[in-house]
């Protein structure tokens, strides 16, 4: 029996497991079992996190769904869920070491898919940083702090920062001071100029105070609990709530260093196989294949699931062609948005309509595989 072990309880891991389990029986009668390893008991719909930190906007059950229940249709002979954290990988021995309730558990594999994702450089509400309970508590804490704050600064003007500032300003733009700090000359740097211009205008319409070409040093906590930031121009900014949205780190600490690039991302070839590691593959944010964006992860998941089935059927896998087209869509408050496909700017009304709910209705269908 072939044992496929998948690491990660997010989009990469859960979607790949479902795609394989739903389709493998159509192509081969070879015996198999899938084990999904996740440090999170629940799937976190972090696409909606910028709105989720605002009190009363999104119920907890629309942000989190239990993973194991979503796989109940396959039966224990075909699927097993392991709640634990990957701590070590023995490529030669084809063994993964997982910390399960403080105990080191060794899991052997024939194929290993690493879809462990990434985390923010500074722990916050946008990605899980260890457990479902932990990120739930973080979101609840942020909701309380957002409610109480009179001045909020968002540092980092990439998509997460812009969406977060937009959501906050839509709700509180006339009652709280919302500041967005960008280290570059505009927001959404390296995106088409027409998109950055539109985003900037939409933010300003919502009363966001956008500071460009500005760096902020790590904040100092004052005796009253407020944060003091020293900006690159020398200005000292005192705020009630500091929200960092810059930088991600791959969750690859368990992978031997020879398989990682200088930034800690897993190096893969055109088949998503980890370079130099037979039978080990990596997709999504943890790999060096494409930008860490949802639609790229979906494409990669489809491809790796098909290749796994081909391998079990004794057929050659097919190479993946990475996308050379940049794309983005984001909501800026509930009534505006912008985005692009390549150099083509997407109409704001289209982005707003598509992203109106931040896709929370797709969470249950993603976890149980019914929308794949």
From Swiss-Prot:
Please report which protein family the annotation says this sequence is part of. Answer: Belongs to the FAD-dependent oxidoreductase family.
Task: Write out the pathway annotation from the protein's UniProt entry.
Answer: Secondary metabolite biosynthesis
Q: What is this protein called?
A: Oxidoreductase ptaL
The record's EC number reads: 1.-.-.-
UniProt remark on cofactor binding: Binds 6-hydroxy-FAD non-covalently.
Record flagged with keyword Transport: no
Explain the induction of this protein.
The cluster is expressed in rice fermentation medium. Three regulators are located in the cluster (ptaR1, ptaR2 and ptaR3), suggesting that the production of pestheic acid is controlled by a complex regulatory mechanism.
Annotated signal sequence range: 1-16
Question: What stretch or stretches form a coiled coil here?
Answer: none
Glycosylation-annotated residues: 251
Q: What does this protein do?
A: Oxidoreductase; part of the gene cluster that mediates the biosynthesis of pestheic acid, a diphenyl ether which is a biosynthetic precursor of the unique chloropupukeananes. The biosynthesis initiates from condensation of acetate and malonate units catalyzed by the non-reducing PKS ptaA. As the ptaA protein is TE/CLC domain-deficient, hydrolysis and Claisen cyclization of the polyketide could be catalyzed by ptaB containing a beta-lactamase domain.
Q: What are the recorded GO MF terms, alphabetically?
A: electron-transferring-flavoprotein dehydrogenase activity; flavin adenine dinucleotide binding
Q: What is the native source organism of this protein?
A: Pestalotiopsis fici (strain W106-1 / CGMCC3.15140)
Residues annotated as binding 6-hydroxy-FAD are 8-12, 51, 285
Required co-factor(s) are: 6-hydroxy-FAD
Kind of enzyme, top EC level? oxidoreductase
Q: Which UniProt keywords apply?
A: FAD, Flavoprotein, Glycoprotein, Oxidoreductase, Signal
- Would you tell me the Gene Ontology cellular component terms? cytoplasm
């Amino acid at each position: 029996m072939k044992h496929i072990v998948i690491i990660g309880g997010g989009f990469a891991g859960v979607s790949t497991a479902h795609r394989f389990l739903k389709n493998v029986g159509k192509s081969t009668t070879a015996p198999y079992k899938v084990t999904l390893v996740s440090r999170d008991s629940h799937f976190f719909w972090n696409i909606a996190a910028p709105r989720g930190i605002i009190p009363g906007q999104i119920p907890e059950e629309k942000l989190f769904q239990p993973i194991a229940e979503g796989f109940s249709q396959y039966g224990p002979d075909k699927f097993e869920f392991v709640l634990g954290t990957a701590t070590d990988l023995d490529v030669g021995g084809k063994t993964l070491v997982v910390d399960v309730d403080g105990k080191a558990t060794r899991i052997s594999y024939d194929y290993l898919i690493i879809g462990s994702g990434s985390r923010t450089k500074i722990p916050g509400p946008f990605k899980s940083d260890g457990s479902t309970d932990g990120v739930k508590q973080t979101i609840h804490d942020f909701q309380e702090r957002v409610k109480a704050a009179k001045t909020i600064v968002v540092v980092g003007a990439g998509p997460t920062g812009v969406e977060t500032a937009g959501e906050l300003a839509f709700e509180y733009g006339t009652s709280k001071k919302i500041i967005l700090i960008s280290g570059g000359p505009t927001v959404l740097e390296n995106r088409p100029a027409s998109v950055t211009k539109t985003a900037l205008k939409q933010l300003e319409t919502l009363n966001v105070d956008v500071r460009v070409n500005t760096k902020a040093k790590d904040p100092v906590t004052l005796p009253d609990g407020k944060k003091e930031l020293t900006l690159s121009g020398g200005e000292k900014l005192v705020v009630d709530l500091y929200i960092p949205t810059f930088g991600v780190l791959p969750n690859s600490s368990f992978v031997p260093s020879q398989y990682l690039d200088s930034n800690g991302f897993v190096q893969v070839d055109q088949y998503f196989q980890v370079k130099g590691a037979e039978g080990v593959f990596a997709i999504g944010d943890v790999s060096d294949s494409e930008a860490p964006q949802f639609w790229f992860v979906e494409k990669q998941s489809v491809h790796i699931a098909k290749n796994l089935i081909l391998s079990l059927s004794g057929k050659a896998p097919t190479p993946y062609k990475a996308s050379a087209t940049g794309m983005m869509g984001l909501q800026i408050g509930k009534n505006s948005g912008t985005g692009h496909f390549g150099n083509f700017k997407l109409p704001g009304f289209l982005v707003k309509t598509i992203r109106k709910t931040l896709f929370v209705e797709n969470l249950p269908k993603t976890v149980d595989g019914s929308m794949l």
